Amino acid sequence: MKVLNAVRGGFAAALLLALVSALPGTAHAASLEVKIGNFTFGPQKITVKVGDTVTWINEDDIPHTIVSTGKFRSKALDTEDKYSFTFTTAGTYEYFCGLHPHMQGSIVVETATGSAATQ
C-alpha cells in the first residue's frame, strides 16, 4: 500500500509540473547575435520579441560601436568584444556604428502578440 501511495504521489507531482510548464508566460526570452565584420552588421535587420537580448560580436580587426540615438550606446568594441542589450519596449530601433556611420542596422521588437509599436 505504501508503494502504491508513493507511485500515486510521484505521478501527481509529475502531472502538476507538466501542467505548470505549459502555462502561458513561462516561455524564456531568446538571445540573438549580430556579427560585426567587414564594416557590416549581419544580419542587418532582425525581429525579436519584448524581453529578448541581442548581442553584437565584433569579428572585425578594428574597433566598432553600436549606437541607437537616445536608446543605447556601446563602448568601442575591439576584436571579439561583445555588447548586449535587452529590449523591453516594442518598436523599431535603428542603430549604427559611431566610428563608421555608414554601418547601419535595425531591430524590430514585437510584443508577444506580434505587433511592433512606433518608437
Summary of predicted features, one role per range:
Residues 2-10, 18-119:
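Extracytoplasmic copper-binding redox domains, predominantly the cupredoxin/blue-copper superfamily
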